[in-house]
Amino acid sequence: MKVQIIFYSMYGHIFRMAEAVAEGARSVAGAEVGLFRVPELVPDEVLEKSGAKTAQQAFAHVPVAKTEQLPEADAIIFGTPTRFGNMCAQMRNFLDQTGGLWMKGSLVGKVGSVFTSTATQHGGQESTILSTHITLLHQGMVLVGLPYTEKRQMGMDEILGGSPYGAATIAGGDGSRMPSQTEIEMAKFQGRHVAEIASALVRGRAA
């Protein structure tokens, strides 16, 4: 059973969450987990001035995702920071290149899931995940979120990202806040949950 985690990260917040999602998925017996980043669209000079170029060196080793690899997966988990309540342009550009897969029905029946990050507590976590779900539904994917059996998302003793739609982190207006341990654990849960469901579907189809 193969799980692909496709993400975009500018300053490392989503990368850290992606690592946690991958860790959770790998905890499921038989799971083969791959981590991939979508191509960057921002010019190098802009990345350098913003400090993102340096931050991205931490995950420069992660292979770049290609749309033709997606049909190989049984589950695909997408990670994107929010941009005005929607997925980032880099992820939108990547998904907009999957028209050929849609024509062939290549992703129909595969498990799809989404996690995100925002600058503020109410900065578009839910709308970003839900709007990304629309694309996955057009592809015929089976959506999986973060159920309330992950009790940590109900905590009231700290500021947290995350909702039933998927794990999330709050980066802060200046990007200085990295994912908390609770947010990391929620991301692990989502990865494990997705992999368990994908594994059950694969076994069921083989029966």
UniProtKB/Swiss-Prot annotation:
Residues 3-194 form the Flavodoxin-like domain. InterPro entries: Flavodoxin/NO_synth (IPR008254), Flavoprotein-like_sf (IPR029039), Flavoprotein_WrbA-like (IPR010089), FMN_Rdtase-like_dom (IPR005025), NQO (IPR037513). The keyword Transport does not apply. It catalyses: a quinone + NADH + H(+) = a quinol + NAD(+); a quinone + NADPH + H(+) = a quinol + NADP(+). Transmembrane segments: none annotated. PROSITE patterns: FLAVODOXIN_LIKE. Disulfide bonds: none annotated. It comes from the Bacteria. Gene3D superfamilies: 3.40.50.360. Its EC number is 1.6.5.2. One of its GO terms (molecular function) is NADH:ubiquinone reductase (non-electrogenic) activity. Keywords: Flavoprotein, FMN, NAD, NADP, Nucleotide-binding, Oxidoreductase. NAD(+) binds at Y11. GO terms for cellular component: membrane. Binds 1 FMN per monomer. It is an enzyme of class 1 (oxidoreductase). FMN binds at residues 9-14, 82-84, 117-123, 138. Substrate binds at W102. Its cofactor is FMN. HAMAP family: NQOR (MF_01017). Belongs to the WrbA family. This is NAD(P)H dehydrogenase (quinone).
